[in-house]
UniProtKB/Swiss-Prot annotation:
InterPro entries: AP_endonuc_2, AP_endonuc_F2_Zn_BS, Xyl_isomerase-like_sf, Xyl_isomerase-like_TIM-brl. It catalyses: Endonucleolytic cleavage to 5'-phosphooligonucleotide end-products. Zn(2+) 2 binds at E146, D180, H215, E260. Binds 3 Zn(2+) ions. One of its GO terms (biological process) is base-excision repair. The lineage of its organism: Bacteria, Bacillati, Bacillota, Bacilli, Bacillales. Zn(2+) 3 binds at H183, D228, H230. Zn(2+) 1 binds at H69, H111, E146. Keywords: DNA damage, DNA repair, Endonuclease, Hydrolase, Metal-binding, Nuclease, Zinc. This is Probable endonuclease 4. Coiled coil: none annotated. Endonuclease IV plays a role in DNA repair. It cleaves phosphodiester bonds at apurinic or apyrimidinic (AP) sites, generating a 3'-hydroxyl group and a 5'-terminal sugar phosphate.
Amino acid sequence: MLKIGSHVSMSGKKMLLAASEEAVSYGATTFMIYTGAPQNTRRKPIEELNIEAGRKHMELNGIEEIIVHAPYIINVGNTTKPETFQLGVDFLRMEIERTSALGVAKQIVLHPGAHVGAGADAGIQQIIKGLNEVLTPEQTVNIALETMAGKGTECGRSFEEIAKIIDGVKYNEKLSVCFDTCHTHDAGYDIVNDFDGVLNEFDKIVGIDRLQVLHINDSKNVRGAGKDRHENIGFGHIGYKALHHIVHHPQLMHVPKILETPYVGEDKKDKKPPYKLEIEMLKNGTFDEGLLEKIKAQ
């Protein structure tokens, strides 16, 4: 079974149930959530996440596994502000606890961190330090380090940087990788013409068994731009053909694929989610040039 879905919202009283209902309405077989707002530390207690009803709904609809994304405010790469580093460590511990409580997520996607001017090597050492403070041999969920675009002072912009982090962490069996198509393209990897070559390179440097999550996004920018601006499937510089190839790649069939493409529409208050039609299009093998108009008309 193709495990494909999108980022969905866990909100209101329904929480996990709302997320599962939204995912099912898109024809998804997996989905990704934040356990609270990605930009702040406000979190509902675990008992208010409506886990039992959410899991029941998932089971009825054939969804076995979901992905959690850690909030953006976590930056364990910060060497200049001890309080930012500490917040990242404490918050990541809490996210592991919350994800474990869900019982249906094995991976927490984490942006490795930004060195905020101290240099990539210093940032990587700080990320290693942070992960060593957080990871325990008993935990049941992995931290999936996301491949980054190289915007600003981001660490994790190359497979070598990801490998360096993994190699420095004591309990690194608890680390995996989230391969983001927009980010790797923007970082300079040629996933359009030679995805198999890029995957082989990843395998040599990191190990393909670590690739446990895929973020499927097109890119608004040319390869190597270091920008990280997502585009709808087939409407960017990666293109439908390459993304369809990645989604159906025989070596990655077991990996959950998550769309984080932008909502569609000119009116900021009335943008429409693209995921139902994008998922259909990635399943059926034919690019639809009129897709954005169809999404707007939903």
